[in-house]
Amino acid sequence: MNKLILSILSVLLIVSIASAGNGIDISSGTNPSSSDLACLAKQNSKIIVQTWSGGYGFNSNVPSIVQAAKSAGLSVDLYAFLCSQCSGITDPAEAIKTLVSKLNGVKYGTLWIDVEQCNGCWSSTLSSNAQYVQTAVQTASQLGVNVGVYSSEGEWPQTVGSLTSLSSFPLWYAHYDNNPSFSDQGYNFGGWSKAVMKQYQGTTTQCGVSVDLNWFPGSGSSTTSSSATSSSTTGRPLTSSSGAGTGGHSSSSGAGTGGHSSTTGGQTSGQTSGQTSGSSNQPLSSGSSQDSSNSGSSNQPLSSGSSQDSSNSGSSNQPLSSGSSQTSGQTSGSSNQPLSSGSSQDSGSNSGSQGTTGSQSGSSSSNPLTSGSQSGSSGSQSTSSGSQSGSSGATGTSSTASSTSATGSSSTGSSTGSSSGSNDSGSNDSGSSSGSNNSGSSSGSNNSGSSSGSASSSGSSGSSGSGNYTSGSGNGAFLF
């Protein structure tokens, strides 16, 4: 009898494992080829594609990606990051109507409304944000679209407060615990008591494509497909982001939450914005380490990395992109604070004697960091840099920076370096700096000693872009 029971349990376990599904989500800055999708289909049964980015609007690559994904054997869902303070179409009902119109004839499973934080994206009044999100979801439902919500335990209350009226819609949540299951119960927010999909890992790479990883129970092969003109039976890929590190698209709080987002061209973990090495509920996108900011404000959810710093000044709706250094909103430990801004920011890869500018929190080891203020600990490296800011397309100069040495020694010398980075869709922010270190002092937490030096820097920075962009929830995320 005992052997029979064990045999039955074994069969049930095997069936359960076999019926579970793997999915990936990609940001609007990612445009995989047919061969990429064929490769991805060997490891996944679903793909969720970002179709709308903040104030930038529709991702024109969606129709061709959907067609190629279906040909590769993948079921397709879409996600949209909308925000009340983004440029472009600011009315949520109008944005949804425009999106649905552009998706006319495109068959997909579920349209996920991505709810996550990003710099300058939302009103400071939670009730206003809640009304915005409700209108977006309800408008999509009224238009006959299968609609769900993507968010995380940390992002939801930060954005819409105690809103519970949408709990009857499917939930895709983010919790970066690298555990493809619902055992974490990270879906207990907003009135939900269950979820349909979990984003359990932020930006990583499969088949050379930057993706977030998702898990859902069951085969996911029999959901109703939405299009503006017809319905048919097809698979519904489900998605989500946030958690003890959540990602798509932005900065963190709680055990850290965030949205999704990932792009191939130097994207953030996106997507917001890599994934966190500790707990973080912020959807962030790819990048092993992140310091960045546009010299324009960003309406995209920031992307993730193992360390995070981001800030924006000026105006720009572009989600920050990843590179060797990139925008992030996700902490490498647990953090309940939104990311802080530095006095100057450049994102992307850096060459020269110093690294990327921007303020950075967390710890870094043996890495020269450039920039405004720094907290945390650093290896036996000294850093110096000038601060830089500018509005989109503008040239400005700034001077004065502090340099720090973790060992208490001071250094003198001159250094030059240039940095450039690219946003998901458009133009790059770049700047150059040169200067000699003279004298001065700086201090940081967990650092001892003093260093002296002054630096001046001048350069131009700006960001512009049109077309497809990434968001944070971490579709961040994106899932941006």
Swiss-Prot record:
Q: What class of enzyme is it?
A: hydrolase
Superkingdom of source: Eukaryota
Q: Where are the transmembrane segments?
A: none
BP GO terms, sorted = cell motility; cell wall macromolecule catabolic process; cell-cell adhesion; defense response to bacterium; glucose homeostasis; killing of cells of another organism; peptidoglycan catabolic process; signal transduction
Primary location recorded for the protein, binned into one broad class: secreted
* UniProt-annotated glycosylation sites, renumbered to this chain: N423, N428, N437, N446, N468
Q: Where is the active site?
A: D25, D114, E116
Q: List, alphabetically, the CDD domains matched.
A: GH25_Lys1-like
UniProt lineage: Eukaryota, Amoebozoa, Evosea, Eumycetozoa, Dictyostelia
**Protein's name in the database:** Probable GH family 25 lysozyme 3
Q: Which UniProt keywords apply?
A: Antimicrobial, Bacteriolytic enzyme, Glycoprotein, Glycosidase, Hydrolase, Secreted, Signal
**GO annotations of cellular component type:** extracellular region
Instruction: Give one Pfam family.
Output: Glyco_hydro_25
Q: Does the keyword Hydrolase apply?
A: yes
Q: Which reaction does it catalyse?
A: Hydrolysis of (1->4)-beta-linkages between N-acetylmuramic acid and N-acetyl-D-glucosamine residues in a peptidoglycan and between N-acetyl-D-glucosamine residues in chitodextrins
